[in-house]
Amino acid sequence: MPKRKKQNQPQPPQHLALSERDEPGDEEDERPMGPPSLLGPPPMANGKPGDPKSVFHRGPPGSRGPMIPPLLSLPPPPRGRGHIRGGLGPRSSPYGRGWWGVNTEPPFPGPGHGGPSREIFYQEPRNPRRLKSWSLVKNTYPPKDSPPMMEDKSDRPVCRHFSKKGHCRYEDHCAFYHPGVNGPPL
């Protein structure tokens, strides 16, 4: 395979230039070397730097596939904590004033952070009226021991499927009238 041979060729002596220097960032004609940028290399598409088509496809060297642009990857807004007093801005410390306002606790409390567990955090509130109505509906059905009683649906329109084919795939759960099954025959 010719592609494997190209990959195994020795790299150009790019690393030697770094080792010849005393420290990175000594030379004044180059940009001072600091911590690596989170944005990766400058955008390139088809070998052209700065091409607008390549903005969404940049990533760290060696990575493949699209990367989310940094402006679209902000942390999610906190839920259930009221409005943010500190506003959007850089965080001074992980739990201090900044993204989460005056709160001194992490934004998503969990078992590792000493707060309540996430299960409670994401649990939706219960509706007592809904629970009460379900208990009433549950008690209106006859017990399983007694023979089932069919609901009279003769006041409803006749089921088209039952009238054409003689059966309906919804059977007892159909909302329409099945003559002779859930009411008097026609």
From Swiss-Prot:
SUPFAM superfamilies noted in UniProt: CCCH zinc finger
Keyword set includes Metal-binding: yes
Domain of life of the native organism: Eukaryota
Annotated zinc fingers (C3H1-type), start-end: 153-181
MF terms (GO), sorted A to Z: zinc ion binding
Coiled coil: none
Annotated region described as Disordered, given as residue ranges: 1-97
Keywords, ordered alphabetically: Metal-binding, Zinc, Zinc-finger
InterPro entries: PRR3, Znf_CCCH, Znf_CCCH_sf
Biased composition (Pro residues): 33-44, 67-79
Entry annotated with the keyword Ion transport: no
PANTHER family for this protein: PROLINE-RICH PROTEIN 3, PROLINE-RICH PROTEIN 3-RELATED
Name the UniProt record assigns to this protein: Proline-rich protein 3
Gene source species: Rattus norvegicus (Rat)
